[in-house]
Design a protein with these regions (language model features):
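Compositionally biased, intrinsically disordered low-complexity regions
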Residues: 16, 117, 144-147
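Non-catalytic terminal/interface segments that mediate subunit docking, oligomerization
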Residues: 1-48
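Feature targets compositionally biased, intrinsically disordered low-complexity regions
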Residues: 13, 91, 141-143
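The C-terminal output helix
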Residues: 134-147
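Cofactor-cradling patches in redox/metallo enzymes
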Residues: 30-40, 44-117, 122-131, 136
Length: 147
């Protein structure tokens, strides 16, 4: 099996740190998103659920993430996504990461309101959006696909 797998070229589209925000125990949707992103060639660092924004930023820096994706399944925890955007701005790290938000109560309007770079409706959309954002970032920086 290992021999067969070694013939399959690995596409490294980039690194994504995923987390369900502090105060939110929901994990299933984020797990599905993680699986679909991995299948599409992303390196996914899944931090789990109830993750404070400071920890999300710390891990994103540690893994040199291209994208930070946060999930909020409760309207009461959506403010954590906003808190992350504020932290990124305050620390001067906003330009270092692409941010994506998702979760049942989230919308494109919410993403725009809090300053997130993108919103994804579901796991399939997350892959499409992530690929598009990585390609746009590569064009801006003059770099091609990561190898």
């Amino acid at each position: 099996d290992d021999e067969k797998n070694s013939e399959i070229p690995f596409i490294n589209r980039g690194t994504i740190v995923l987390a369900t925000v502090a105060g939110d125990v929901h994990d299933i949707g984020k797990g599905i998103v993680a699986s679909t992103l991995k299948s599409a060639g992303f390196r996914v660092i899944d931090l789990g659920n109830e993750v404070p924004v400071e920890k999300i930023l710390e891990e994103a820096k540690r893994y040199n993430a291209d994208i930070i994706g946060t999930s909020a399944l409760l309207t009461s925890t959506m403010s954590e996504q906003k808190k992350l955007e504020k932290l990124l701005a305050e620390t001067g790290e906003k330009a270092s990461f692409i941010t994506m938000v998702g979760g049942a109560p989230c919308t494109q309007r919410w993403a725009k309101k809090i300053g997130a770079d993108a919103y994804s409706e579901d796991a399939i959309d997350a892959v499409r959006v992530a690929i598009t954002l990585i390609e746009e970032k590569a064009k801006k920086s003059g770099k091609g696909d990561k190898k």
